[in-house]
C-alpha cells in the first residue's frame, strides 16, 4: 500500500525547536556505510598489527632487542605507540574517505546542517540527542577512533603473547568477535558489550540503545559513551605496563 507518511507516523522525535530538513543523501549514505563496515576496518587493523611483536619471535630478532639496554622499555613502548598511531590515523582517514566518496557520488555535501532525526527509518533517526549531520559525523569518527585504539590494544597484546603472526591474527580475531554473541542476548550484559571494539564503533546503536541514560557500575554512574572512553583508556594504559 502506498501513500503519504506524516512526521508522526515516521516516529520522529520532538524537540523544543523545529527540525531542519534538507537533501542529505551524502551524509545518510556515509553513515550507513560506516555503520556496516566497522568489522571490515577492524580486520584490516588486525592483519596489519598482528605481526608487530610475533614477527620478531619468528625471525629471532626478539632475543637481540630484549638483550639491549632499552629493549624491554623504549623499543616495546615505541611499537605500542606506533600501533596506536596507525590505528588512530587509519580510523580518521577511513571515515573521511567514505564521506568524500559519498560527496563525490551525490555531488556535494548539502544537508550538513540537517538534523539526523529527519533521516526516516535510519539507525540514527531515533537517537534522542539532537545533532546535525556534520556534528554526528564527528561523533561517528570519534567512536571509530576509540574502536580502532581498542582493536590496536587487542592486536598488540595477542602479538606479544604469540610467536607466530598467523596465530596472533587468529587469536585476536576470535577475541574481537567474542562480544558479538552476548550482545544478541540483550539485557544488561548485552548493553555492556558496547565497551568492546566490535560494538563501540556503531555510534548509532551506542547512542540509541543506551537511550542517553546512566549506566551503573559501582561506585560510578555514567552514560555508555563515557564508559567506552573510560574502558578504552584503561585498556590502553594497561597495555603499556
Roles of regions detected by a PLM:
Residues 68, 161-162:
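Transmembrane helix irregularities
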Residues 187-195:
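A cytosolic-side transmembrane-helix exit/cap motif
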Residues 166-179, 195-198:
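Central hydrophobic cores of alpha-helical transmembrane segments
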Residues 157-161, 230-241:
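Junction motif at the cytosolic side of a transmembrane helix
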Residues 4-56, 77-161, 172, 180-183, ...:
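Secretory targeting signals
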Residues 72, 164-165:
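Membrane-helix interface/capping residues of multi-pass secondary transporters
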Residues 66-72:
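Short helix-to-coil transition segments within interhelical loops
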Amino acid at each position: 500500500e502506498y501513500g503519504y507518511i506524516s512526521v508522526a507516523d515516521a516516529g520522529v522525535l520532538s524537540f523544543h525547536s523545529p527540525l531542519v530538513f534538507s537533501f542529505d543523501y551524502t551524509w545518510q549514505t556515509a553513515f550507513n556505510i560506516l555503520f556496516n563496515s566497522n568489522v571490515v576496518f577492524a580486520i584490516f587493523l588486525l592483519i596489519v598489527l598482528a605481526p608487530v611483536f610475533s614477527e620478531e619471535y619468528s625471525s629471532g630478532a626478539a632475543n637481540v632487542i630484549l638483550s639491549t639496554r632499552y629493549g624491554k622499555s623504549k623499543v616495546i613502548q615505541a611499537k605500542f605507540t606506533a600501533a596506536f598511531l596507525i590505528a588512530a590515523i587509519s580510523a580518521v582517514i577511513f571515515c573521511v574517505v567514505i564521506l568524500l566518496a559519498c560527496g563525490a557520488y551525490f555531488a556535494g555535501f548539502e544537508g550538513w546542517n540537517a538534523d539526523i532525526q529527519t533521516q526516516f527509518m535510519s539507525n540514527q533517526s531515533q537517537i534522542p540527542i539532537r545533532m546535525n549531520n556534520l556534528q554526528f559525523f564527528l561523533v561517528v569518527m570519534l567512536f571509530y577512533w576509540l574502536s580502532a585504539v581498542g582493536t590496536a590494544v587487542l592486536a598488540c597484546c595477542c602479538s606479544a603473547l604469540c610467536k607466530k603472526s598467523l596465530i596472533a591474527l587468529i587469536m585476536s580475531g576470535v577475541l574481537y568477535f567474542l562480544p558479538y554473541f552476548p550482545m544478541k542476548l540483550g539485557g544488561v550484559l548485552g548493553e555492556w558489550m558496547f565497551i568492546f571494539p566490535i560494538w563501540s564503533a556503531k555510534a548509532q546503536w551506542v547512542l540509541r540503545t543506551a537511550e542517553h541514560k546512566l549506566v551503573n557500575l559501582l561506585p560510578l554512574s555514567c552514560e555508555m559513551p563515557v564508559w567506552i572512553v573510560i574502558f578504552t583508556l584503561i585498556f590502553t594504559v594497561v597495555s603499556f605496563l
